[in-house]
Amino acid sequence: MPRRSQKKPNIAPYKLTWPPETELIGLEFELVPTKDCYLFPQYTIGLHAWFLQQVGSTDSELSAYLHDGESEKPFTLSALNGEIISSGRQIQLSANISYRWYVTALSNRVQQWMAQWVENLPEVLELKNAPLQIRSVKIAHPPTTYKQLLESDLSETFALKFLSPTSFRRKGHHFPLPVPVNVFHSYLRRWNDFSGMSVDQDAFLAWVDDYILITRCQLTTAKVLAGKKGAVTGFTGAIELSLSRDAAKQPEFGQLFSALGKLAPYCGTGHKTTFGLGQTRLGWSSQVVQDIPDVQTVLAKRIEDLTQIFKARRKRTGGDRADEIASKWATILARREMGESLQVVAEDLEMPYETVKTYVKLARRALKSEE
């Protein structure tokens, strides 16, 4: 049963401290709607935008870096965890019910900002159409550094739980299986970007392919929304990974394998981890992961179907950037079909309103010609 929050005043600043040399930390926010709220399925875009607005209001230099589309993102954001139900074409958050939201930092620079941020948090997270009171915040993943992870005790076997749908990019497509090479490539990218201890990617991943075994797995898949545009097929569940006997021939890679497993709860797995995908924890669990609201699944399936139609059409006509444009057309049209205004869609996608208006007209025309 969901836990109903006791009414109490918002307490700020929150008495959270951690060492200044910290590079990795995770925070858990308790958010409480004061009334029943209704959101469109892609609400994680709003969480992402609110977080970046918080950064931008106090540190313009860090904000510019976080908006850089070329670099690995030194933070992750979860979706809301709690009682979320479908209500027509929207999802509903219930009044006075606690929802959990997780934010992690993957670099010293970001955690420095977070340390100052939690001392002066706003009382309300202003999610579109759903003001959420920030009731409390606590440390979810303890402060540490990359060096401390690397020097920690070797774990030859560990399990990973994938709490939110997780997917990888492979040859231009989504790949919804936790193959060790894909899993550790995901972690190594963050490690090489933020640890200051870069490792040869090809050599390590070849070692992973040869010596890392999946000893147990329990997985399921679902179609989900993926950030600002498109939909993906992602997996949830758990896997157990072990070093094979011959892995000891390269002990430094064995130690890195162990460290990257401990990094997983901080950095998440796969892509779109700043939009709620890939939430990962250590340990095994056979429990069913929280259901994705039906309306989110319906929208994700509609976006995927439209994307395939538009991709096929644009390739026939020789259009450039076919995949990207097809995904945008599909996302805009599907969200409009669900009742969202084009103005809201334009704001979420950070596109000019007139461009979005043109795209939805072109998408409808293309769809009609296919009928």
Predicted regions located by residue number:
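RNA-interacting cores
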Residues: 1-371
